[in-house]
A protein has these predicted regions:
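Conserved N-terminal beta1-alpha1 strand-loop-helix module at the mouth
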Residues: 1-73, 79-81, 91-93, 99-107
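Glycine/Thr-rich beta-alpha phosphate-binding loop at enzyme active sites
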Residues: 69, 78, 90-139, 145
């Protein structure tokens, strides 16, 4: 199982220390998601995180940060749906249906499938997937190691997925 954490959409005091501690405890990948914030704040945060962890950070905004800070890659979403011209490197994206996962996952290093559970960070953002739909997508090999669950994934949910062997 790969542990990926997505940041809160806003910055907070000592966020760099918490991110560093997560990496020290085994975090695989951090997705830096700070929509509608000036790039300079992301730059400042990245300068406070040890360089050795930058190769494990994916940015959702301000794609130039990938090169400037030697980050792992970029993440495409509704706000930023296309990679920069002549971009080479890791790309992930967000998907919101089984059909979208099926059609897009082959073009990316991995995709987020969301929301698997009702969101705890977005108001009125509810899961539309049934357990049977997820099982069928797994049987059809639509859900595989390139598909990451997103949306209120908690320790309890992680244990359930680990037991079932999906997402």
């Amino acid at each position: 199982m790969k542990l990926i954490v997505v940041t809160t959409p806003t910055f907070f005091v000592e966020e760099d220390k918490i991110i560093t501690a997560l990496f020290e405890e085994g975090l695989d990948v951090l997705h830096l998601r700070k929509p509608e914030t000036p790039a300079m704040y992301s730059e400042r945060l990245l300068t406070l995180i040890p360089d050795k962890y930058h190769r494990r950070i994916v940015t959702h905004e301000h794609f130039y940060l990938k090169e400037e800070f030697n980050l792992m890659g970029i993440h495409l979403n509704a706000r930023n749906p296309k990679e920069p011209h002549d971009y080479y490197g890791h790309i992930s994206c967000s998907c919101h249906s089984v059909e979208e996962v099926k059609n897009r996952k082959h073009f990316y290093d991995y995709v987020f499938m969301s929301p698997i559970y009702d969101s705890i960070s977005k108001v009125n953002y509810y899961s539309t997937y049934t357990a049977e739909e997820l099982r069928e997508a797994q049987r059809a090999k639509i859900i595989d190691s390139k598909v990451m669950a997103l949306g209120a994934v908690s320790y309890t949910h992680l244990r359930a997925h680990e037991t079932r062997g999906n997402l």
